[in-house]
Regions:
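Alpha-helical transmembrane segments and their immediate juxtamembrane cytosolic regions
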Residues: 2-408
Length: 408
């Protein structure tokens, strides 16, 4: 990409390389530790949810409302992407910042393929060594074991995805689409958010999605989930300030709490079917199914309610954000790509132990705690190495969206 830019004529590059004279958009400059904290917590929750029949997963938010940790992860990813690349686009222009975004998308793609190779090797080894093909079936890996040549090609095209490996392909596609979205956000944020909402609506009404292999479609429809990613970017580029009065209103707080209580009551009827009669029939017919694939409006609203309550009770300047007790989650959030990949590997390892060794409650708790401790240890090691590298005089590299935070 750099060579292409260098070889292009100055007349072609100059208008794109220089930031245009547009209305100023505030790009956050201060690090917001809440982003790292909640992204780290989301990674822990995703890990716990990825372990089948794990009793510890009852502490995750998916059991008490319509949304889950995925919404947190995607929103923060959009926020931090705008924080990093928004400033770059304003200072260095569209071409350079777009090249950085595409480079990051390529890095995540490489990480996804590497994780796929390790993950498939782990599943294949366990399935064959313990003569238990159910592992491969549960992890959606049977096609790989039967037709590895075809399946590998489909995996490279992001069409074949084993269980628990759907988030990174979504993130890759969102980053590939991000340069023009960011350009528009910096010039007219309302139009950009409106275009995102329009695409979301079209995806719902026209059934747009990307095909998967061997059948079906993407578990996270990028045409729908982009709305949450763009909304996060919009918040980072001044949207949060525009909503500050609304978020500070007691009415907003009580409406959000009321919706969270309503969602909790509905979800309890899923866990306790005998209470299902409490749900009016007309309400059930209107609500269901609450579609995760296409980011149902009820899921989006539930995330917004959670965010509104969180912002109200957890300000950016809360001293507790710098306490040692929250440091483990913050460290994991600052290295989200590596920790997510590690979590996928650890979740299957925990599932294997629970099936082949012992699956009691104590083992489930021990494996869950051990997995999180390993994730924290690796995040601390990565942070230490980054510190040593910077002290050693290594030239500072531009931040990427995994290591960034901005003020909300």
């Amino acid at each position: 990409m750099r060579n292409q830019i260098a070889d292009a004529s100055p007349e072609l590059v100059a208008p794109l390389a220089r930031p245009a004279a547009v209305s100023p958009v505030v790009v956050p400059t201060e690090r917001d530790l809440r982003l790292d904290l909640f992204r780290g917590l989301a990674l822990w929750l995703i890990f716990l949810d990825h372990i089948p029949t794990n009793i510890v997963s009852w502490i995750t938010i998916r059991n008490y409302g319509f949304s889950d940790a995925t919404e947190i992860f995607i929103f923060i990813s959009g926020y931090t992407a705008a924080f990093v690349y928004g400033r770059s686009m304003r200072e260095r222009g569209f071409v350079v910042s777009s090249a950085r975004i595409l480079k990051r998308a390529w890095q995540i793609y490489v990480a996804h393929i590497f994780l796929f190779a390790i993950y498939m090797a782990e599943i294949a080894y366990v399935s064959s060594s313990f003569e238990n093909p159910l592992f491969a079936e549960e992890m959606n890996a049977l096609d790989f074991l039967k037709n590895p040549d075809v399946t590998i090609i489909q995996a490279l095209l992001l069409k074949f995805k084993p269980a628990n490996m759907d988030i990174l392909p979504l993130y890759i596609v969102l980053l590939l689409l991000f340069p023009p979205i960011l350009w528009l956000l910096l010039r007219n944020a309302v139009v950009a958010l409106g275009a995102s909402l329009l695409l979301y609506s079209l995806a719902w009404h026209l059934g747009w999605n990307i095909a998967s292999y061997p059948t079906g479609h993407w578990w996270f429809n990028p045409f729908a989930w982009q709305l949450l990613f763009v909304f996060g970017a919009w918040c980072a580029l001044g949207g949060a300030q525009r909503l500050s009065r609304v978020l500070a209103s007691p009415v907003t707080l009580w409406v959000a709490i009321g919706y969270l209580v309503f969602a909790l009551a509905v979800v309890m009827t899923w866990h306790f079917p005998r209470a299902a009669f409490l749900m009016p029939r007309w309400l059930s017919e209107w609500m269901y199914p609450i579609d995760k694939v296409n980011l149902d409006v009820l899921r989006f609203a539930h995330f917004l309610a959670l965010a509104a309550v969180t912002v109200h009770f957890l300000p950016a300047n809360w001293p507790g954000l710098k306490s040692r007790w929250l440091r483990p989650a913050i460290l994991c959030g600052q290295h989200s790509l590596e920790i997510f990949c590690l979590g996928v590997f650890l979740a299957f390892a925990a599932h294997f132990v629970m099936v082949e060794v012992y699956g009691g409650v104590l083992m489930q708790v021990a494996l869950s705690v051990a997995g999180i401790l390993i994730m924290v240890g690796v995040a601390a090691l990565l942070s230490w190495y980054k510190t040593v590298e910077s002290r050693g005089g290594t030239p500072k590299r531009p931040s990427d969206a995994d290591l960034a935070g901005g003020s909300a």
